[in-house]
């Protein structure tokens, strides 16, 4: 199971769905964002 877009994630785990990455611009609130 992966974390969808705008879902909460942890930057030290690769838990976002394919095509997304964990963005921590406002730590500790990290969310999955589109790679594009």
UniProtKB/Swiss-Prot annotation:
Gene Ontology cellular-component terms for this entry are: extracellular region; host cell presynaptic membrane
Report whether Secreted shows up as a keyword of the record: yes
Q: Which PROSITE patterns match?
A: MU_AGATOXIN (PS60015)
What domain of life does the UniProt record list for this protein's source? Eukaryota
Q: Which UniProt keywords apply?
A: Amidation, Disulfide bond, Ion channel impairing toxin, Knottin, Neurotoxin, Presynaptic neurotoxin, Secreted, Toxin, Voltage-gated sodium channel impairing toxin
Residues where Asparagine amide is found: 36
Describe, from its UniProt entry, the tissues in which this protein is expressed: Expressed by the venom gland.
MF terms from GO for this chain are:
sodium channel regulator activity; toxin activity
Family recorded in the similarity comment: Belongs to the neurotoxin 07 (Beta/delta-agtx) family. 04 (aga-5) subfamily.
Its biological purpose: Insecticidal neurotoxin that induces an irreversible spastic paralysis when injected into insects. Modifies presynaptic voltage-gated sodium channels (Nav), causing them to open at the normal resting potential of the nerve. This leads to spontaneous release of neurotransmitter and repetitive action potentials in motor neurons.
The name of this protein is Mu-agatoxin-Aa1a
- Species of origin reads Agelenopsis aperta
């Amino acid at each position: 199971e992966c974390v969808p877009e705008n879902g909460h994630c942890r930057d030290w785990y690769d838990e976002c769905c394919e095509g997304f990455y964990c963005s921590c611009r406002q730590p500790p609130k990290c969310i999955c964002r589109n790679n594009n």
